[in-house]
Amino acid sequence: MANNHHPKDEAYLSSVIPKRIRLFEEIQAEQLEQLQSRPHDPIKITLLPDGIEKEGRRWETSPMDIAVQISKGLAKSALVSSVNHVLWDMNRPLEGDCSLEIFGFDSDQGRNTFWHSSAHILGQALEQEYGCKLCIGPCEPRDEGFYYDSLYYGELGLNDNHFPNIEAKLPIRMAEFGVLHRNEDSGALGGMTRVRRFVQDDAHIFCRVDQVEEEVKGVLDFIDYVYRIFGFTYELTLSTRPKDHIGDLETWAKAENDLEKALDDFGKPWVIKEGDGAFYGPKIDITVSDARNRKFQCATIQLDFQLPACFKLKYLSEKNEMEAPVMIHSAVLGSIERMFAILLEHYKGIWPFWLSPRQAIVCSLSEDCSSYAKQVQKQINEVGYYVDIDESDRSLRKKVADARDAPYNYILVVGQKEVATGQVTVRLREDPEGRKDLPEMSIESLLDEFKFKTVNFL
C-alpha cells in the first residue's frame, strides 16, 4: 500500500487510467459496429441439462436474454453461461445454433467467475486508492497461491537474514478477523450466539518468557477499554490444566502462575475453574451478560508454551542461543456474531451514535427543498456518516415520528428557511416531545458534533 516510503505514483495513474478507458471504449465501439453489420437470422438454443429448446437470433440474443425469458430469479442469480460447453459471458451474443447452460454462485463455474472478476475490480481499486502495483499471477481461486520465491516480495519477504533481528523485536503481535468453523450439535445452535461458522478477532503474540506477564496485562487492559465503551460488566475466570493436556507439569505451573500474577495486577475479581484450560495451556476467559442476564464467554487470553515447541519455532536470544518463544492466543470480541447479538439486546436497538447504522436522516418539507436536502445528505455522507433522506409528501409530523421509531439518532429538517440560511433544524431521537431539540445548525457545526460523538464513543 502507499505510505511515506512507497508513495502513490499519481503521474503514472493519471496517464495510464485514461488510456485504459479510451482503449476499452474503442474496442467496445468496434465490436458494436461489427455486431450491427452481421446477419441476425434465427437460431435454435438447447438448454442444458433439461434439453428445452428456445429460439433466438444470431449475433443478437444473449444468454441473459434467455435467462430473462425463463424467470427473473434465474436472470438475477446468473453469473456465467456455457455455450457448447465453453464458458460464455452472460451478455455476449450467441453466434449460432448451440447448447446453453446457465450457472449461479452455487456452482463452481459461477463462483470461479465471480471471484476472478471481483479480483480484477479489487485490484483496480487498490491501485487507484493505495497505489498498489498490479502484476500477472496465477488465477487459482481455490488455492492459496503462496508459491512465489521470497525475493519476489523484496523487503516484505521473510528470509534467513531476518532471524537474528527477531529477538530484538519481540514481542511480535499479529491480528486478523478470521473465519472459523466449529462442528456444533444442532441442539446447541442458537440464533447468532452459537453458530457453526463465525468470524473472530483472532490475535497471537510471540514473546519471551520474561515478557508474558506484561503482555497478558496489556491484553486485559485492551479488553477492559473496549468493554467499558460498550458499557459491559464482565467476569474473569482462570481455567487451569485439563486431564488431556500436553507438555510437562513444570511448564504448566509456570504458565498458570504468570496468568495469576497478571490477573492480580489487573485488580479486578477473578475465580479459578480447575481443569477447564485448553490442552496446550491455561487461559483467562471473560464472560459478559446480555439483557436477559444470560452469560456468554466472549474475550479470551490463552497462554501457549506447547505449540511453539511442536512447530519448532526458535529465535536467537541475547545469549546467542536458540530458544522457543511463548505464544499468547487472544480475542477481544470473540465471535463477532455472538457479540453483535449481545449488543443488539444490550442497546435494545437504541444504538449510540458512534455505532449506529442509522445516524441521521434528512427530512425535506416540500419538493422545493429536495435539492438542498440531497446536498445536505451528500455532504454528510462524504465525511463517512450514515445518512438517509425522506423526500416523501407526508406531513413533517409523520416523517419525524417514523424517523424516531426507526430509530435515527439525528433528524435533520430542511425547509425554505434552512435553504435560505444553508443550515438544518436538528431534532433528537431521545426527545419525542421536542423540548430539547437543538437550534438551527450549520452543516459544519453539525459535523463537528458528529465527530465529537464518534471519537468519544457517544
Swiss-Prot record:
Reaction equation(s) it catalyzes: tRNA(Thr) + L-threonine + ATP = L-threonyl-tRNA(Thr) + AMP + diphosphate + H(+)
Molecular function in Gene Ontology: ATP binding; threonine-tRNA ligase activity
GO biological process: threonyl-tRNA aminoacylation
Domain TGS: 41-104
Keyword line: Aminoacyl-tRNA synthetase, ATP-binding, Cytoplasm, Ligase, Nucleotide-binding, Protein biosynthesis
Tagged with keyword RNA-binding: no
GO CC annotation: cytoplasm
EC number: 6.1.1.3
Superkingdom: Eukaryota
Subcellular location: Cytoplasm
Keyword Cytoplasm: yes
Record-stated family: Belongs to the class-II aminoacyl-tRNA synthetase family.
UniProt name for this protein: Probable threonine--tRNA ligase, cytoplasmic
Taxonomic source organism: Arabidopsis thaliana (Mouse-ear cress)
Lineage: Eukaryota, Viridiplantae, Streptophyta, Embryophyta, Tracheophyta
